[in-house]
Amino acid sequence: VTDVDASKCMVAWARENAQASSLADRPCRWIVDDCAKFVQREIRRGSRYDAVIMDPPSYGRGPNGEIWKLEDNVYDLITLTEQVLSDKPLFFAINSYTEGLSPAVMEYVLKTTLCPKVGGHTSCDEIGLPVTATGGVVPCGATAVWEE
């Protein structure tokens, strides 16, 4: 497992979650870095991964003030990252909490980028928070998955 996040706090939190889940002794690399730059280096190194779980931010600023928006970059991020998938990948999942980026759009990007190269199928859904008092669910995001 390789956990990559540009936020030192998020990486620390992920490490704490692994420890709380009794997974601290499992092999995991904890990397604080820009995910796209990390993937570009992994491509040059020839690294390959069997699975990807992506939870990119909706919005961010680079060190030089560059503005990054997921809805403008989701296709490029997925096409970059699919280059590090192994020859027989297991799955590729992406979550988003970005208004205006629907589950169907994310599924379409996975379907048009991954399926022609490695086959498989895609699915998508909304992410929701359960409301105990009413038994309802408040939509708060989207998820899309490609599987072999």
Predicted regions and their residues:
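Helix-to-beta-strand junctions that scaffold the AdoMet/dcAdoMet cofactor pocket
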Residues: 85-87
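Short amphipathic alpha-helical segments
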Residues: 15, 43-44, 64-67, 105-107
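Conserved SAM-binding motif I beta-strand of class I
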Residues: 1-5
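S-adenosyl-L-methionine
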Residues: 7-51
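Active-site-proximal loop/turn and secondary-structure-junction residues that shape catalytic pockets
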Residues: 34-36, 58, 98
